[in-house]
């Protein structure tokens, strides 16, 4: 099977476009903003910000503002691994508790960033 139009950006754009829509991203930029938010979650925020810099000329200013807030934060899978590894060394007996809380912390951090982005979208 060969699907050249199917990429990580396309999949993440479709999945996270719901959040971009809810935050108030203009309709023409929803999928691009969703792809950036998904890339932040899967890879990290630095890669997503670098991609956004290259798209800056094509995006609506409101999209840039909302997406900047949505990308701000360390809620991604690599940060959860760093948390488990770093704090797990300080308290090795609690490593399983950290692993259980890692996903919840990821969701909470993501929702906090998305709430800030939504408020920015309301005020713009």
Language-model-detected regions and their locations in the chain:
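Transmembrane helical segments that form the transport core of multi-pass membrane transport proteins
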Residues: 1-56
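C-terminal transmembrane helix pair
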Residues: 40-124
């Amino acid at each position: 099977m060969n699907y050249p139009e199917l990429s990580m950006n396309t999949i993440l754009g479709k999945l996270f476009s719901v959040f971009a829509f809810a935050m108030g991203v203009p309709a023409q930029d929803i999928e691009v903003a969703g792809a950036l938010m998904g890339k932040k979650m899967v890879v990290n925020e630095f890669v997503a910000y670098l991609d956004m810099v290259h798209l800056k000329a094509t995006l609506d200013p409101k999209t840039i503002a909302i997406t900047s807030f949505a990308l701000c934060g360390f809620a991604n899978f690599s940060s959860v691994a760093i948390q488990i590894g770093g704090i797990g060394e300080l308290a090795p007996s609690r490593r399983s508790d950290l692993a259980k809380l890692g996903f919840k912390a990821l969701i909470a951090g993501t929702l906090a960033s998305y709430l800030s982005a939504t408020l920015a979208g309301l005020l713009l």
